[in-house]
Amino acid sequence: MERTELLKPRTLADLIRILHELFAGDEVNVEEVQAVLEAYESNPAEWALYAKFDQYRYTRNLVDQGNGKFNLMILCWGEGHGSSIHDHTDSHCFLKLLQGNLKETLFDWPDKKSNEMIKKSERTLRENQCAYINDSIGLHRVENVSHTEPAVSLHLYSPPFDTCHAFDQRTGHKNKVTMTFHSKFGIRTPFTTSGSLENN
């Protein structure tokens, strides 16, 4: 879908409406989606409803299901919380910082031998900055390294997925994990005792 003029979302609801338009077809224009996410100025009054924290781990909070084409969610990172090294199950992954800072570390895919994984790059994402990754780029880990400030990020995955692989940095060994939502549409999901691992 060609855009002669990029639409600037004024609100989170506006952003969601534009994303539905961008994902109406079968093709994903990565640059266009990223530009729209970057154009949205974070406003806590708009996303606070979805920002549900947990004392012990970061949380995944579903905002919109994108008519089956994408999942839009808000991840809440308490002080010192981080993800495992993980893949994205052949999906597009867009990330936008809404509050605070997050450290993203990229890794190469491990080789067949049992060796320590190779770090490709590392960067700090700040409020309103965006990032993009897919499995052809590599694997990543996302962390809130602050001991005093929480962080909140907006994530879009297309197509949606509910399992991925988590990797051991020391050996490259991978495990398949199931991801759960801490809340859906602002409502806390029922507590489950399953062994699922929340990833982003």
Curated annotation (Swiss-Prot):
Top-level taxon: Eukaryota
CDD domains xrefs: cupin_CDO
Annotated residues for binding of Fe cation: 86, 88, 140
Cross-link (3'-(S-cysteinyl)-tyrosine (Cys-Tyr)): 93-157
Induction entry: By increase of sulfur amino acid intake.
PTM description: The thioether cross-link between Cys-93 and Tyr-157 plays a structural role through stabilizing the Fe(2+) ion, and prevents the production of highly damaging free hydroxyl radicals by holding the oxygen radical via hydroxyl hydrogen.
Cofactor comment text: Binds 1 Fe cation per subunit. Ni(2+) and Zn(2+) can be used to a lesser extent.
A GO BP annotation: L-cysteine catabolic process
Cellular compartments per GO CC: cytosol
GO MF term (any one): zinc ion binding
Coiled coil: none
Keywords for the protein's UniProt record, in alphabetical order: Dioxygenase, Iron, Metal-binding, Oxidoreductase, Thioether bond
Tissue specificity statement from the Swiss-Prot or TrEMBL entry: Highest levels in liver. Significant expression also in kidney, lung and brain.
Cofactor or coenzyme needed: Fe cation; Ni(2+); Zn(2+)
Keyword Disulfide bond applies: no
Keyword Iron applies: yes
EC numbers: 1.13.11.20
Catalytic activity of the protein: L-cysteine + O2 = 3-sulfino-L-alanine + H(+)
Primary role: Catalyzes the oxidation of cysteine to cysteine sulfinic acid with addition of molecular dioxygen.
Family: Belongs to the cysteine dioxygenase family.
Protein name: Cysteine dioxygenase type 1
